[in-house]
Amino acid sequence: MAGRFDPLTRTTVRGGATRVPAPTPATPNATATGGTAGTGAKTGTGARPRTATGGINGQAATGTAPRTRHYTPPGPLTLGLVLGPLRRGPHDPTFRVTPDGAVWRASQTPAGPGTLRVTARAADGTVTGEAWGPGADWLLDRLPALLGAEDDPAAFVPRHRLVHASHRSRPGLRLTRTGLVLESLIPSVLEQKVTADEAYRAWRILVRQYGTPAPGPAPDRMYAMPDARTWCRIPSWDWHKAGVDSKRSGTILRAARVAPRLEEAAGMDLPEASARLELVPGIGPWTSAETLQRSNGHPDAVTVGDLHLPGIIGFALAGDRTTDDAAMLELLAPYEGQRHRATRLILLAGLTPPRRKPRMPRTDIGRL
């Protein structure tokens, strides 16, 4: 069934399924003029005209022309699958999909905050990136890596019928690499041992309260996450109001204090990168894997210690919903070196065991 439809459930969303509308046809008043497709050229003159009174959805336009880069991927590329894992919930203030088929991201880069707008042209697959803010050049320099240029899908060989069907029906799946460790680490820590909705709410509250408004004509209420110094200055009562307990907030504070050392992991191989992150108390194999899947785009960064994942993998591959981590890793052994990609394809297939017990209850410590 995996190859016949694309379900949108909690499981497939976790696999990175994000629906991106088909791009609207280009018009003379809404086309970028800078750069040459396929060359990776950048220019500061390829502005998409905005209204004088407000950019998109009413946010004030800055009048600053974006930096622009065009990139032609070597094969099929589906923006929703490639960038979907970077979205933390449907109301993530750092990630937005607009009706014109554009994906917007606001990031805190080493050069400062930046906004990136990514669109793909249906005719030839050319991707255009437009960026604003101090981090614009940094974001455009890494646009190909963000879109999976450093990934090698050809190295993956399906070994199960379901995986083969999921793989065949998603030729545009590539593993993103953001090059930003803290950006993926902090929301992963927030997701430790709570429901996804609780973690998304905490991320949304903290980023909107302490983050930087997204530069340029970004959609309303978009923010780049706080920098490391700002994370360290968040008072305990605001963590509490966001529903974050002292264990998770303490882990984030410890990570923020050594942020430069953690960011070095973006250039390391998987074992060294995992070891670097796990030196911080409160960061274990689950959190490091969830982080490095996004920051490093490593195809073998398999998540262990997860409440639901072993049962999903076991049910999909062996019909066993009681699978534990050890049995899951045994089932994934044929995909050694590509276990993260295999896991994503299984999640995207949407085959999950029937629910037998109530959902994990939500707890809002901010009301205490």
Model-derived features: positions:
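HhH-family (HhH-GPD) DNA N-glycosylase catalytic core used in base-excision repair
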Residues: M1-G35, T39-L368
